[in-house]
Each structure stands twice: as structure tokens, then as C-alpha cells.
Amino acid sequence: EMVIRDWSSDVCSSDLDDGRTLWVYSGAHDMYFVGDFDENGLYQPIQSVGQLSYNSQSYAAQTYYYEPGKPVIRFAWNRSDIPGAPFNGSMCTPTEMTLKKHGDRYYLSALPIKSTENLVVKSDKLDDFTLTHCTHELGSKTCRISFTVKEGDLTCSLYGLEMKLDKNGLTCGESILPRLKNEPMKVDIITDTNSVEIYLNGVANTVIAHVLDEAKPTFTIHAEDPVEVQNLTVSELSL
């Protein structure tokens, strides 16, 4: 169970599988502490500060929705600008917020809400395979792409936007998303006409301002050496 108070100094509680209740204290740019309150009612972090968003576009303004027994939903704002566009920023995809434990550390996790699946109008799924190159034609400017890579270096291109994965994590533009040690890299991407959201294992994400290159309506994966890709799913969304 999680309860969240809104604003740039949000506090939320999370009841974990081991019965322990921890509190997450988050601020601007999605920096956060995980901790508990002592006998004097003072908040005490149990680990060093964490980071969820890896860009400069994570705006403090955000709204949370919660019903007992259901996931906490966050509505966040992407303040990235596109020169010449008649708007400033855009809403991000609503995400489910949870705490994950990896090793001896807790991570704040954000992943697109499950009801995003209701927007899928077409979906292609590929079983596990080893590749050096593949190309998937896209018929929609709004799509969701997910896949898992255990090891290996590769480069992805989505409507002309390039992303690189290696042993350290995922790089796109100025954003560097670190991977969890000894964990497969689970990548989840949602794109529309002016932005691309990238989630790595749920515990690291970024939003990239990107005007889709209509001359390159494809998603491609390229690797110099064979790389095993698991559970590749390309879905077109009705937005």
C-alpha cells in the first residue's frame, strides 16, 4: 500500500513484501530518499539519495491518484521545448509507482500504467532470437516498444532517434540510464509525435524531445556482434 502527498517534496509510504513499511521522500528532478521515522517523529533515510529521472526535463509539478488496494498512479509533466512548436512541454504517460529492492538497496520504480494496453490497435511479438540487425516498419507515430537484453552492445533507432545499450546501461542524447548490476536490461519505450519516453527496468527513465522523422518510419536494432534479444514487442497505439 502506498499513500502520497502532492508537491515537489512528496512523501509516500510503501508496505513491502517483508511486512516492513518505508517512506519515500522525493523532490524536484525525481531525486528521492527512502527511510523511516524515528521515535521522535523525525525522518531518517536508510540509504543515500536515489534518482529516478535522468534528464533535466523532469518538472516538479505532478499529481498522484490512489485508491486503497490499487497502485499509486502519477501524472507528471515533461517540460522539454521544441523550437517553433506552439506549445511548451507535454504530459507524460501516467505511471504506477512502487518500491523495488535490489541487493541491499531500495529503488523507486515508475512504469506505464497497465491500462495503456487498452490503447493498442496492433501488436507484433517476436520470440527470443539472436541478431546483428533487424528492422520493423511502423505504421503509427504513436507506439510502444519493449524488449529485454541480458548482455551485449547494440544500437536502436526509433523514427530517427538513436539509443545505445551496453554493459553500463542505456544512452540517448544527454541522458545516461544506469543498469541494475547483474540484471537483464528491460527496456520500455513510448513515443508520440514530439517526445519519446524511455524506461530501463522501471528504476531509471528519461523523456526526450524529438520530432519524429517521417522519412524513417522504422524501429531498428543493430549490433556489431550477435546479441540475444528477448520478448520484443512492437505495438501501435490509438492516439
Predicted regions and their residues:
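Alpha-helix capping and helix-loop boundary segments enriched in small/acidic/polar residues
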Residues: 1, 18-19, 23, 50-54, ...
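Hydrophobic core segments of beta-strands in well-ordered, beta-rich domains
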Residues: 12-28, 71-82
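Poly-acidic low-complexity segments
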Residues: 6, 18, 164-166
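Single conserved hydrophobic/aromatic residue that forms the stacking wall/gate
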Residues: 1-12
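Beta-rich accessory regions
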Residues: 31, 38-59, 64-239
